[in-house]
UniProtKB/Swiss-Prot annotation:
Cell wall formation. Adds enolpyruvyl to UDP-N-acetylglucosamine. The keyword Cell wall biogenesis/degradation applies. GO terms for biological process: cell division; cell wall organization; peptidoglycan biosynthetic process; regulation of cell shape; UDP-N-acetylgalactosamine biosynthetic process. The keyword RNA-binding does not apply. This is UDP-N-acetylglucosamine 1-carboxyvinyltransferase 1. Its EC number is 2.5.1.7. InterPro entries: Enolpyruvate_Tfrase_dom, Enolpyruvate_Tfrase_sf, MurA_subfamily, RNA3'P_cycl/enolpyr_Trfase_a/b, UDP_GlcNAc_COvinyl_MurA.
Length: 434
């Protein structure tokens, strides 16, 4: 079993560079299927297990995909298959993002119902609502969702009941080849939506208003391969901001975009963290004492749900009572029990978590319950007494590139080991970076 073993007590200092955004690259790779002429070349692509998975989905759909040196080249000019099977989709719910492009290109798509992190139900009903509004017929059964259209998709006015990021992306992609104009209202506003729109426009689409609540997509007859650079990962940047703050360290986070981090920055400054915008990125200096705050996750530009668990780790070190309320996903508090194993004073009340601090955390063996929880448990381990062993690293690998190595370079006492091979002695870990 692979584990990350971390010993607490080190202030982290230095420089770290964030990768291209996981939440941007996956829908962009899926949208590359829309190009029936030429090759798409994507740069700043992070080397993540989810990227390998979506690439395999595209290959199964008959696209040619080459991934090397943080660059993905995609040729989808051949006739595409219409089915994304369970063996791929079960690993990652973002696989459902191929549905819109397939429906637009082929008039038909058959996708296994998605997997990914076990965070509530996370239904795809808003995706399907959009496809139906554009003239598609949708059937769900036997573990698959199938959509087909006679002729071609037609532009429509679509109102999302919730500003779902995935639904906004999928509908926006499908609408690029629809006949007429699609107006998508109550659309998600995340930076990753803007990045996808920029990529679609580079291919020849006509998308306007991305980043606002109303997006207009004027359909075109054909899309072409293009070059595109993926935006930096704001969630990885936020995670390293917490690493600096929680250890009282001083970290320059290169390649971070300050405009994408406003809600995170606001809450951390409220806690007493010093944040300086520099030409290279964002510098974060942790205080001697953290102040308690309340946080409510919201769609962008509100506080991102993907930073909830990391901030929970930070608030466990704050002086006073803090509360985090989760409004985006249900059942995203599974990591609370793992924090309790580390001696945290923390409890769940409905859709909120109450924390009393500061906590003297104790190292323990804990299991990552999802991607961001994996990072949060490691962050908590940075300030725990003794050794923290984090298992279920498959979650971590879905969203972070060499996370333990980046932390080690900043001064953390941390190692990733495979205990199938041999039991790792605590002394061996304590000797790291001595």
């Amino acid at each position: 079993m692979e584990k990350i073993i971390v010993r607490g007590g080190k202030r982290l200092n230095g420089t770290v560079r964030v990768e291209g955004a996981k939440n941007a690259v996956l829908p962009i790779i899926a949208a590359a299927l829309l190009a029936s002429d030429g090759k798409n070349v994507l740069s700043e692509v992070p080397v993540l297990s989810d990227v390998y998975t979506i690439n395999e989905v595209l290959r199964h759909l008959n696209a040619e995909v080459v991934f090397e040196n943080n660059q993905v080249t995609i040729d989808s000019s051949k006739e595409l298959n219409i089915e994304a099977p369970f063996e791929y989709v079960r690993k990652m719910r973002a696989s459902v993002q191929v549905m819109g492009p397939l429906l637009a290109r082929n008039g038909r798509a058959r996708i296994a119902l998605p997997g990914g992190c076990a965070i509530g139900s996370r239904p795809i009903d808003q995706h399907l609502k959009g496809f139906e509004a554009m003239g598609a017929k949708v059937q769900v059964g036997n573990g698959f969702v199938e959509a087909y259209v006679e002729g071609e998709l037609k532009g429509a006015k679509i109102y999302l009941d919730f500003p779902s990021v995935g639904a906004t992306e999928n509908i926006m992609s499908a609408a690029t080849l629809a006949k007429g104009t699609t107006i998508l209202e109550n659309a998600a506003k995340e930076p990753e939506i803007v990045d996808l729109a920029n990529f679609l426009n580079a291919m020849g689409a006509k998308v306007r208003g991305a980043g606002t609540g109303t997006i207009r997509i004027e359909g075109v007859d054909k899309l072409y391969g293009a070059n595109h650079s993926i935006i930096p990962d704001r969630i990885e940047a936020g995670t390293f901001m917490v690493a600096a703050a929680i250890t009282g360290g001083d970290i320059l986070i290169e390649n971070a975009v300050p405009e994408h981090l406003r809600s995170i920055t606001a809450k951390m400054e409220e806690m007493g963290v010093k944040i300086i915008e520099e030409n290279e990125g964002v510098r974060v200096i942790g205080p001697d004492k953290l102040k308690a705050v309340d946080i409510k996750t919201m769609p962008h530009p509100g506080f991102p749900t993907d930073m909830q668990s990391q901030m929970m780790a930070l608030l466990l070190q704050a002086d006073g009572t803090s509360m985090i309320t989760e409004t985006v996903f249900e059942n995203r508090f599974m990591h609370v029990e793992e924090f309790r194993r580390m001696n945290a004073d923390i409890k769940i009340e409905g859709r909120s978590v109450i924390m009393n601090g500061p906590n003297s955390l104790q190292g323990a063996e804990v299991a990552a319950t999802d991607l961001r929880a994996a990072a949060a448990l490691i962050l908590a381990g940075l300030v725990s007494e003794g050794y923290t062993r984090v298992t279920e690293l498959k979650h971590l690998d879905r969203g972070y590139v060499n996370f333990h190595k980046k932390l080690a370079a900043l001064g953390a006492t941390i190692e990733r080991v495979n205990e199938k091979v041999e039991e790792v002695k605590e002394q061996e870990v304590s000797d790291l970076h001595a």
